[in-house]
Amino acid sequence: MLTTSIAGYQKSKHCGYCKQKDGSCSYYMSCDNMRVDHYQELMDRGWRRSGTTYYKPDLPRSCCPHYTIRLKASDFKAKKEQRSAINKLNSYVIGPEYRRKAAMLCPEPRDIKRQKRDHFDVVSAVHKAEYERLAKPVGKKTKDAIQPAHKFEVNLEPDSCTKEKHDVMLRYQTEIHKDPEWRWTEASFERFLCNGLDRKLLKVKGKTMKLGSHHMCYRLDGKLVAVGVLDLLPHAVSSVYLFYDPDYQEWDWGKISAMHEIALVIEKGYEYYYMGYYIHSCTKMRYKGRFEPSYILDPESLEWNLLDDEFRKKLDKRKYVSLSEDQRIQAHEGSDGRNHRSLPNETRSEPSIVEDVTTKKLEPELKGEEIELDSEPSDPDDTEIPDGSLFDYNIPGVLKKGEVEKLNLGTMKLLVRTSLIDLEDLRGWEEWQIDDPGTIKGIVAELIATTGPKLLKDTALALF
């Protein structure tokens, strides 16, 4: 049984991406016992987690709309710059001396060489220089196994908090992102990037799948140089965060880690690779769309659409794009291309949904390592709670009031100290309205509208 606490629909006063004060709107909840299958369901409805805080952005009311992006790993076609990032690291690790000796002691057949040259295999490429997988033929004279120039190891480990990891994280945040040191105490690191989803093993078709939150740790000559924070789900590997030692920033860790994670998806059968949110207006985020073919979750229909040049052109012109909404408008309201989403009369100002962003000055193209990862949710002190019910705001991907009214919300549980109570047994339950956020029924209705009905029977609400 999931135990959730509700923060509700909130508007932030500051954007961590564009630094403007327009901010964005999201629905927030917290859960410290989230199941991997439930989180998979939430991600496919546009949710994301930061520690035990879960949030679903309201894209039309965001200055920088967050689009869920994923890749079917088996279809991945590496681009030149992605291949170069892995090849550069492999060449450094192996070294010229090892390469020369290995070519003499165990030469590759020509057809194998030709196959490798003509076809890039991401799984083989990412493991090529890993020490435990590297061939170590014995020298004819020395009778000793030849060794690479460096010992490179990649291991999937529990997402535990250690001094070694925290030290790397602290240097990364302070030197790369210029954060103040006080912001990333060991407790903060543990809260946001450690002890996430519960870990367990699942056997599927003879394969053992690891599930839950893990750290993919990269070590060079015994030293921890980078850590990828991952959520392993029944049908996906979700990239949560990446941090690395600034002494090794010459390596393109954004591409290197993504290719290792794609290889993990392929090898272990997770099927999809989620890279968090894609923010088209943030140039540092566009590297995510370079892993092709990537798909964007339609905010309205919750279907997946290919992120191709046609889609990018739409995003160049409009911050908010929903192909299903565009099709509906063209079919029923004309083909002027404008988004006629009905918004309520509100006292607060809203960012324009159809704002033309082509006139804005774009940031220069960036090196691969200069990447922007998903920011954490807004500080509660930097938010405000809009008036009215969630159903007044017509949020994409959220159940409408009429849809929620058809659900039996009373079967959901309320956690009171250590006891679970059916909501329908509460005094006043039948009189309460689902569009009244001041009642427990209204709170539950908004929660299920945003999470979807599948979580209804497995969730308990904690109010205190």
Predicted regions and their residues:
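Short, structured secondary-structure boundary patches
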Residues: L71-F76, S294-D298
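Acyl-donor binding region in acyl/amide transferases
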Residues: Q10, Q20-E41, R49-S50, K113, ...
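Short polybasic/polar patches that bind polyanions
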Residues: M43, L170, T174, I266
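Generic alpha-helical structural element
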Residues: T4, Y27-C31, V154-C161, K178, ...
